[in-house]
Design a protein with these regions (language model features):
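Active-site loop/helix belt of alpha/beta enzymes
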Residues: 338, 342-347, 353
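Conserved phosphate/anionic-ligand binding catalytic regions in large, soluble enzymes, centered on
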Residues: 117, 309-325
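Conserved catalytic cores of very large enzyme subunits
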Residues: 2-311, 332, 338-342, 358-515
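Well-ordered alpha-helical scaffold segments within catalytic/enzyme domains
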Residues: 324-332
């Protein structure tokens, strides 16, 4: 007789294979996750296991047997220059070669989503192969390439980078993205005031007005951590070492930790340090399996051909629910202040970020770049209820954009592997994109690492860091979607008031399960 566990597994698999809204490829993906999650979890200390079971710590549903890194950032420049022995490919000689080679390699780059989350610094990669092509000839090729990416790798966590320099490829990508208004790929423009022309930044702002893309990253801030050109921004907005990536992402539920604290002092001296240690234990256990049992780094041709280096992978030490944690702690202390509203509450939030950063900087991990994890303000998952992503302000009653940026900016100094806040701007900004440029520059002057904006009235909007079409959400449940992240946005709409709120789109990252 089948056990209750076996019956439950069969029921979940049956739900997947009979779903009217999943494509065959999507069904295969979720069936594989069910199989992986039927395996035993890596051995954990008792307290770490309890924290995971109680939801104080979340492993992002990455799976019980991490047999591949969460995020992989290959050295695409090396690949284009030398080709691949494993794939029996010679190096590129022209732009057509380069685009063809990239489209081949993308299908061999693993990630938590089973699709590549990093496409490379595309303008820097492709510009050397342009040769004698005219701008029109470049535009045709890039538009075709852009459409190919969305149709064959339909996942909005797939992320391309451009900038800080100007080039015909840079302009072609911006034109294609604005015209096609695709959910994927995600896009970040890396800004450097010493390199980026003013008219190029204005063009980037016009693109945001048109399609809510790209993110704009503060290049000099990232350069200090990774060195110039030594990193990529992937998935939603994760900053990670190039030729490496992110091995795993585990996150603290700060709201749950605050609920288990007797006072503000108890939070900082007992509960937060305790759960930080448990999170490190989970990170180490997952990385131990990846490095020692999965054999990924021993067998991958990406390692053998020098496209990735196991020592350049870093675990991400995530957190979320800061807003709720601060409000709970203020209530326990009798402080009449709310996060994002009063300075006293904001200071508690900054203190939490500072203590997390100090812990991560001073706590070694078994496997990781520089033997440390990297702090990440995690942007939520689609099933989260009652928590605000990362260090963001609670949704629905945000202040004006300038006050908003000034309030969240101090957090950005601490989160080396990514933090983002989404501004929602009135569509009148389309008549004055220079105002958007000034907002961005002001944000960077205040210390922000990333600038991201949605423009009211656009069908294409950003949910956390990934894109969805609002029109797709309305028809997903009846018809399904070829894009793997539409269901996440639809689930977020069911679990929150995303479609009822003022035009700020909430943030949720990939959740590794299927629910009808």
């Amino acid at each position: 007789m089948p056990t209750s566990h076996e019956n439950a597994l069969q029921q979940r698999c049956q739900q997947i294979v009979t779903s009217p809204v999943l494509s065959p490829e999507q069904k295969r993906h979720f069936l594989a996750l069910e199989a992986e999650n039927n395996l035993p979890y890596p051995a954990l200390p008792v307290e770490a296991r309890r924290a995971l079971d109680e939801g104080v710590i979340c492993d992002m549903f990455e799976g019980h047997a991490p047999y591949k890194p969460r995020y992989v950032l290959p050295d695409y420049a090396r690949f284009l220059a030398h080709g691949s022995e494993w794939l029996e490919l010679e190096g590129a000689k022209d732009l057509d070669d380069a685009l063809s080679l990239l489209t081949i390699l993308y299908h061999h780059v693993p990630s938590v989503t089973s699709m590549p989350v990093y496409l490379g610094q595309l303008d820097a990669l492709l510009q050397p192969y342009v040769r004698i092509l005219t701008q029109d000839e470049i535009d045709i090729r890039i538009k075709r390439f852009w459409r190919y990416l969305d149709r064959t790798l339909p996942d909005a966590f797939m992320h391309a980078n451009i900038g800080p320099s100007d080039s015909p490829i840079t302009r072609a990508i911006l034109r294609a993205d604005a015209e096609l208004k695709q959910v994927s790929p995600n896009l970040t423009f890396i800004y450097d005031p010493e390199i980026t022309p003013d008219d190029l930044l204005l063009e980037v702002a016009k693109n945001i007005c048109e399609c809510s893309k790209p993110h704009i990253a503060n290049g000099p801030v990232h350069d200090k951590i990774f060195t110039k050109g030594g990193y990529g921004i992937v998935s939603c907005y994760n900053s990670l070492p190039l030729a490496g990536g992110g091995s795993t992402l585990v996150r603290l539920n700060l709201k749950a930790i605050a609920e288990r604290s007797e006072s503000l002092d108890d939070f900082f001296t007992r509960t937060l340090p305790h759960y930080c240690q448990q999170q490190i234990a989970i990170i180490d256990a997952r990385c131990e399996f990846l490095y020692q049992q999965s054999h990924f780094f021993e067998n991958s041709f990406l390692v053998k051909e020098g496209l990735i280096n196991p020592e350049r992978f870093v675990p991400m030490f995530g957190m979320y629910g800061l807003a709720e944690a601060v409000n709970l702690l203020c209530e326990k202390e009798g402080i009449a202040a709310r996060y994002g509203k009063e300075a006293a509450a904001n200071e508690v939030g900054y203190r939490i970020s500072a203590q997390l950063a100090e812990f991560v900087a001073n706590t070694p991990v078994k496997y990781g770049w520089q033997k440390r994890a990297m702090l990440h303000a995690q942007s939520g998952i689609s099933s989260d209820i009652g928590t605000t992503p990362g260090a963001r302000l609670p949704y629905g009653d945000e202040p004006d954009p300038i006050t908003h940026l000034q309030t969240v900016a101090p957090h950005h100094a601490y989160y080396y592997s990514g933090i983002s806040d989404i501004l929602t701007l009135d569509e009148t900004i389309k008549r004055n994109p220079q105002a958007l440029v000034q907002l961005c520059l002001g944000a960077f002057k205040a210390g922000m690492r990333e600038f991201t904006a949605n423009v009211s009235g656009n069908d294409l909007v950003r949910v956390t860091g990934y894109m969805v079409r609002l029109s797709d959400l309305e028809k997903y449940r009846a018809e399904g979607s070829r894009t793997n992240t539409t269901w996440l946005g639809e689930e977020a709409a069911r679990n929150t008031r995303i479609l009822e709120r003022q035009p700020r789109v909430i943030s949720h990252e990939q959740q590794m399960r299927f629910s009808q």
